[in-house]
Amino acid sequence: MSWQTYVDEHLMCDIDGQGQQLAASAIVGHDGSVWAQSSSFPQFKPQEITGIMKDFEEPGHLAPTGLHLGGIKYMVIQGEAGAVIRGKKGSGGITIKKTGQALVFGIYEEPVTPGQCNMVVERLGDYLIDQGL
């Protein structure tokens, strides 16, 4: 299965059969290389991925400045140290799950809820971890 298939079928899927989906998603290597992304995923700067990776290594690193992706600032909210970073911006937000080799991104807007985004992103991330990726 190609990385793009994971994005198209597992991240940009119909959530709970409700006809809702994430606004954008991607799978990005720890080095910032894009493995696959939705057409709506923002163009990001390498230093933004560096900052995200640093927060996984040193939880709380992004809290004072916020999480930036594609020039958009998200307020960092409770995640799981070293495993999941969550951010909020207005009625939307972002979930990032770290696997052994990749970062799985999900960006949502209402009516998708934070919990739905977390479920979609973390489910794929956990699967990739189980596969040794």
Swiss-Prot record:
It comes from the Eukaryota. PROSITE patterns: PROFILIN. Disulfide bonds join 13-117. It is found in: Cytoplasm, Cytoskeleton. SMART domains: PROF. One of its GO terms (cellular component) is cytoskeleton. A motif (Involved in PIP2 interaction) lies at residues 83-99. The keyword Disulfide bond applies. Keywords: Actin-binding, Allergen, Cytoplasm, Cytoskeleton, Disulfide bond, Phosphoprotein. One of its GO terms (molecular function) is actin monomer binding. Pfam families: Profilin (PF00235). Phosphorylated by MAP kinases. Signal peptide: none annotated. The modification Phosphothreonine is found at residue 113. Occurs in many kinds of cells as a complex with monomeric actin in a 1:1 ratio. Belongs to the profilin family. The variability of the residues taking part of IgE-binding epitopes might be responsible of the difference in cross-reactivity among olive pollen cultivars, and between distantly related pollen species, leading to a variable range of allergy reactions among atopic patients. Binds to actin and affects the structure of the cytoskeleton. At high concentrations, profilin prevents the polymerization of actin, whereas it enhances it at low concentrations. PANTHER family: PROFILIN, PROFILIN-5. This is Profilin-2. It comes from Betula pendula (European white birch).
